């Protein structure tokens, strides 16, 4: 089974981190985030770095739409360009599969604000403009990367940790006294479809570490993979429908909130087999899945982050045999 990383890593050395990811996750190399470098290297900062014709800046209240970019916004773009240069150098014109990750429109909406300070959730027109800009930026980036690295197959991971809160009306306003209205499912689907369309022929998955996961909406939007934490899955019927429809399941088998606690390989395999039993499906259906940590590892020590990645890889190498045995 393919194994990969899912988000952030500790430290500030992108070239070294990429080399480690390419060695460990050779079937699907993730371009990690290194938030220790500064605000522009965080998840929201990386997403702002691909926005087209929408300047942003970063102030005391966080990221916001602006008349012109500031140092933080320029740093975000600079980090992304540097990261992609490092990726090209590490790959050295080899065939590879690489996964890029960007915050999706619902999560970007909670982390990007209007000039007056409210979230862009308060302005449907602004949200649509940001989503269109994000999709155009991702599209342009993929086209550029295909020219630069023609032997690479690209996968996009759209991070939506805030999707459950946005869809349930749980996001607080600037004052904290109220909540933004719940977003209609049809609106979320339309926003996601815009981003998925911008990804062209690349495989596009959603990563959602919140609950409940919007399985049906994600499928309608065109996502082909859902990355989530295995042990926190709530609606198993939805999960079964997802995998039986032919969509892929990205199984976060390491609880990354348990910082620096590296589980045994057998423990990770047991979590996959547990999921098979709970779903009551043919174990072979999950062989197309992907193993990963549940979320990012930025809060971990470098040693343990590297070790947990190697553990996930070893579990991926062994779990198919266990699934075959479970099918007999």
Over which residues does each language-model region extend?
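Alpha/beta catalytic barrel-like cores
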Residues: 1-127, 217-224, 247, 278, ...
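Well-ordered, non-membrane alpha-helical segments in soluble/globular domains
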Residues: 14-18, 76-85, 130-137, 183-194, ...
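Short amphipathic alpha-helices and their capping/turn segments at secondary-structure boundaries
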Residues: 18-22, 80-96, 136-153, 237-242, ...
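Active-site groove signature of glycoside hydrolases
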Residues: 99-104, 148-162, 287-292
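Active-site beta-loop-alpha junctions enriched in small/polar residues
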Residues: 103-107, 159-163, 209-213, 231, ...
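Glycine-rich, often proline-containing surface loops adjacent to acidic residues and nearby aromatics
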Residues: 116-124, 157, 163-164, 168-170, ...
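Active-site loop segments of alpha/beta catalytic cores
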Residues: 133, 137-233
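Catalytic-face loop-and-helix region of soluble metabolic enzyme cores
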Residues: 224-325
